[in-house]
Amino acid sequence: MNQEIRERTKWFMNDRFGMFIHWGLYSIPACGEWVMSFKEMTVEDYRPYFEQFDPVDYDPKKWVRLAKEAGMKYVVLTAKHHDGFCLFDSKLTEYKATNTKAGRDLVREFVDACREEGLKVGLYFSIIDWSHPDFPKYGDRQHPMRNNLAYKDEQINFDRYLDFMHGQIEELVTNYGKLDLLWFDFSYDNMTGETWRATELIKMVRKHQPDVIIDNRLEGAGDNHGSIATEHPLIYSGDFASPEQIIPPHGVCDVNGEPIPWELCATMNNHWGYCNFDHQYKTPQMLIRKLVECVSKGGNMILNVGPDAKGNIPEESVKILQEIGKWMKKNKDSIYGCGISRLEKPDWGRYTQKGNAIYAHVYETPLGALPLYGIAPDKLERVTYLADGSIVNRGEAWNTALYTDVAFVSFGEDPVFTYPLPDEKDTVLEIHLKE
């Protein structure tokens, strides 16, 4: 990882936890953000959603406050998704929120809300556009018209599309103040790298926003990292990898074994955009543990919400974030600024580490005392509960005498007895070692 990327991503690798917001016209049919493609809808089929779009409850301040209460440090909004509809006031298209019943620039209000609450500002932009006449259609495996023979011999001017796409990105990086993160989406097949005139694009972005961090999807996607982890990453390889709906088994490292920045993007249920029949929500416990897993492997987690057509985040998502927030309020020090521990993963949970501070994330109730693998008894000064600072009892007893190379702690008075964990989601212990 070069020094420029290291400097740019310092805040990102410190903050660790963000909110993704997928919101657009697709919230009206309420069956996910890919509805136009899955149902092979024409632009004309999709047009009624543009006419209907009227987010009367849109209040980005509520969204951002919810993110902040959950312990999230940055928020990324879909300024434009694959359907081509813009939440911002682009001068290059009429297909935008200002021409709907909303009648205003929804991105402007979002970035203002983030800054007001002190959160980092991120914008997602789809480099794919299913509504643009010069984007490839027939035979493109993602496009709604991929099977429509009417487009088989269509003549398009792809450079005209690229001029348009670059122009819209330039609007975002020049009209909305300092941006902290740009999330491009996505490359596939031969639609990658210089197909997007990616070098030209990155140079333009860096001219206006030299410190913005950028994902790797001008070259890769959720199924590959592109050249970011190679000996010679390309100029458009990005500042961080973006695994989707999966946590890399060993984190993400370059060819020399050095960890590089990465971010898991994950949904709360099984859709990014609002889906009124998808109630398969992950539990707060699971999501907390997945965040910890990401941090323990040197990564971030950006967790998605999909507001409905009126602009309301589903109540299930709100409740989950509130529960995560309760845990984060007490245990945030084991997340922010933390990363890979020098200790191996224990069978009862995970370790995270920040400098010499080691945090044990305990998921399973131990039978008797809890072994702190990798820590010798004579090196341990004390262990405290991170949630309240109280002392955790030492757990060495007659039945641990054989295991002299491992320190033990107990969750109750008698180290031989079994006690319930104080926090069944994740009990965090702060381990203080002797200097």
Give the predicted meaning of each segment:
Residues M1-E435:
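Mature catalytic domains of secreted/periplasmic carbohydrate-active enzymes
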